[in-house]
């Protein structure tokens, strides 16, 4: 009788000691799909033709970091244990502002740079061993962005208020996140750095343009925070 009574009291403790494992075979599926949405913050790295020490303000171009959004689909192809190939096509939207404080006219000092990227990344995802219902991971890869707002075909340039950029940009990416396994789906918050490989600048027609004359190139850099459901 004492043993039965002791067993009754121990059962709840044993149940707590053995957590329920959600989606136990999820990581062994050959292919998984889902969707994501999130926010981004982007700015430009600005490279100059030459540092003009006789007139320092000419190199003092300021990039105002701004916030936008990301949305897209995910496909995950299992390669081996802990390693998968991910395809995450989507849309990235952002509106940045370049400021040229050395220009005197107020209408000349600021230029908006719209970015509406059709975003096509291919990434490798390496995950740690799963701990109960969560698993940390890292990602690395490359992507291409097709900017629908590049103004590259416009004949107008900064002299008429249009800052032009290249329509196709290649990036490299590094990131990390945590997979959480719920009873019905895998939920993943992640952070990813995005860095352009290509110069996105299209120079103005005038080689001595105060907006682009001393610029060697501009390169997107930013951070994306996504919530993924698979």
Where does each model-flagged region fall?
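Bacterial Sec-dependent N-terminal signal peptides
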Residues: 1-23, 227-230
